[in-house]
């Protein structure tokens, strides 16, 4: 991706994050609402941090939220972020963010002026790097560019007495979305010429570039994930999208004993229909690199097969290994601790062991669930049991329910 961006020049992003979230119906501004254990804005920052060609991320927040934002940056290890005090309106906040790059900026926070600046919303966490680059390149070529999406509903205008005045042709009109990008001089010059009315009541940055810098923006059809978290239901939708994204790959950790290998193979065959699955021997998992090098990207889901009755050694070793990393800071990790049992085994002792292990692991944002699989069966029955266990594992990974942590389920 860096090679594809090499002709772009220096690029930065401005994220206005000073909204109060009135439409959300919450006292907490929506950018700070928790989504899967993490503030929404942290997910948005992560999306931009993936693009190494973006050199600076300017987050504009209300003065009363500066300390909170600093704490979020520190806790989640965000990089390349500069905080700026916001204005009373969205446009005034964006203008404050742009001023950081100005040669006339007297504050110590002044940083190198970019050739291209991207403007995005802190409450739009789902932005693809490929599309970001497409918008930025179009802005460099044309002066301005922005994402659009088809209108979902027809837009109508009402008369002063509440009757239909006219409607817009939906096939011709589009919804303006984020991200938008500009040559820095184009958008900064436009904001310098804005009236107070523009700064207080305006909504469209692309229009400011057209009105004050005489630059027509190139409009690009964006992907469907560009939606904005506006209402409370959107928080649930955002959490579902994130859960789906971190549930794509799975690692099965097993030892070399015959029973573990057999069950591990059956689980692999069933789970590969739903996930990208890799199976590794527990003897290989001596360091986190052995696990994470299996995948291109972070693995958040693990199945650990324990053979010995009442033994949690394999699962405990995996928990200890994951706790040495920062992997669980960003997202909750799931470990399904599978225990191979026979008719004579005592599940009560296993239950207390799972709960104790899971309670400690949960403090590190690692969700441990227990699953019993009876191996004292013929081949056909075992296959059916493993198939039922696969359904349980799939539900646990998809839902990531902390209320079920430490529970021992039976396939």
Curated annotation (Swiss-Prot):
Classification via Pfam families: IspD, ISPD_C
GO annotation, cellular component aspect: cytosol
Pathway named in the protein's UniProt entry: Protein modification; protein glycosylation
Family, similarity comment: Belongs to the IspD/TarI cytidylyltransferase family. IspD subfamily.
Site positions per UniProt: Positions substrate for the nucleophilic attack: 170, 228
EC numbers, comma separated: 2.7.7.40
Catalytic activity, reaction form: D-ribitol 5-phosphate + CTP + H(+) = CDP-L-ribitol + diphosphate; D-ribose 5-phosphate + CTP + H(+) = CDP-D-ribose + diphosphate; D-ribulose 5-phosphate + CTP + H(+) = CDP-D-ribulose + diphosphate
Enzyme's top EC category: transferase
A Gene Ontology molecular function term of the record: D-ribitol-5-phosphate cytidylyltransferase activity
Subcellular location as annotated: Cytoplasm, Cytosol
Protein purpose: Cytidylyltransferase required for protein O-linked mannosylation. Catalyzes the formation of CDP-ribitol nucleotide sugar from D-ribitol 5-phosphate. CDP-ribitol is a substrate of FKTN during the biosynthesis of the phosphorylated O-mannosyl trisaccharide (N-acetylgalactosamine-beta-3-N-acetylglucosamine-beta-4-(phosphate-6-)mannose), a carbohydrate structure present in alpha-dystroglycan (DAG1), which is required for binding laminin G-like domain-containing extracellular proteins with high affinity.
UniProt organism field: Xenopus tropicalis (Western clawed frog)
BP terms from Gene Ontology: isoprenoid biosynthetic process; protein O-linked mannosylation
InterPro entries: IspD/TarI, ISPD_C, ISPD_synthase_CS, Nucleotide-diphossugar_trans
Keywords, comma-separated and alphabetical: Cytoplasm, Nucleotidyltransferase, Transferase
Cross-referenced PANTHER family: D-RIBITOL-5-PHOSPHATE CYTIDYLYLTRANSFERASE (PTHR43015:SF1)
The protein's assembly and partners: Homodimer.
Site, Transition state stabilizer: residue positions: 23, 30
Protein's UniProt name: D-ribitol-5-phosphate cytidylyltransferase
